[in-house]
């Protein structure tokens, strides 16, 4: 059976960067510009509005590796604090942003953007609800548009969808049960409907 890739292994450096941010010596960066929401554009986003940017040099090469963006906010008790809204990371030490994490009002991750081929553009989008991963979108042909969608429930894959002919429409579906593919649906005529189902003869393997 044809199975879709479950995801791209994350570089060990990403974990190191995330864990070390809170304790590393910080320096402020003055930066301004407008945000860019287009998927085909560069992954780096300039400081927006009243955001404050703090830089971290984790490998001590004199260049920043992590950028934390915060805004002034208040707790329920009215106490002011710097709320994290976005974090950018350079995980291969080339001076370019490779990962961007967005955070909600509770400072839980809500979205993650990744540059998998290190060309400065977004290739994967991860979406979270209350800090829990619910969907991944991948741009497999690097044209700035997702063509693979992976859906999660309680940390497990439940469905994958794929645009295999670059038509902009899903024409391939995988339904998962107990961490294995249960059945595959294929659209053979481009009408957006499943024309052929294939049952996995060995769903536990």
Where are these regions (language model features)?
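Positively charged n-region of N-terminal signal peptides that target proteins for export
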Residues: 1-5
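Calcium-binding acidic motifs and repeat modules
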Residues: 21-205
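Bacterial N-terminal signal peptides
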Residues: 7-18
């Amino acid at each position: 059976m044809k199975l879709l890739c479950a995801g791209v292994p994350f570089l060990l450096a990403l974990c190191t960067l995330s864990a070390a941010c809170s304790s590393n010596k910080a320096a402020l960066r003055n930066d301004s510009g407008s945000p860019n929401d287009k998927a085909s554009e560069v992954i780096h986003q300039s400081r927006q509005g009243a955001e404050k940017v703090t830089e971290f040099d984790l490998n001590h090469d004199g260049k920043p590796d992590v950028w934390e963006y915060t805004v002034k906010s208040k707790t329920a008790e009215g106490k002011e604090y710097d709320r994290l809204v976005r974090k950018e990371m350079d995980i291969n030490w080339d001076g370019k942003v490779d990962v961007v994490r967005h955070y909600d009002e509770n400072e839980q991750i809500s979205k993650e953007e990744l540059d998998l081929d290190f060309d400065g553009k977004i290739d994967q989008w991860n979406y979270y609800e209350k800090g829990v991963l619910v969907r991944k979108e991948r741009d497999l042909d690097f044209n700035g548009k997702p063509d693979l969608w992976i859906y999660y429930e309680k940390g497990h894959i439940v469905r994958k969808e794929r645009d295999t002919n670059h038509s902009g429409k899903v024409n391939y579906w995988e339904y998962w049960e107990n961490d294995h593919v249960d059945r595959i649906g294929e659209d053979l005529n481009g009408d957006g409907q499943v024309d052929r189902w294939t049952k996995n003869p060995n769903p536990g393997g």
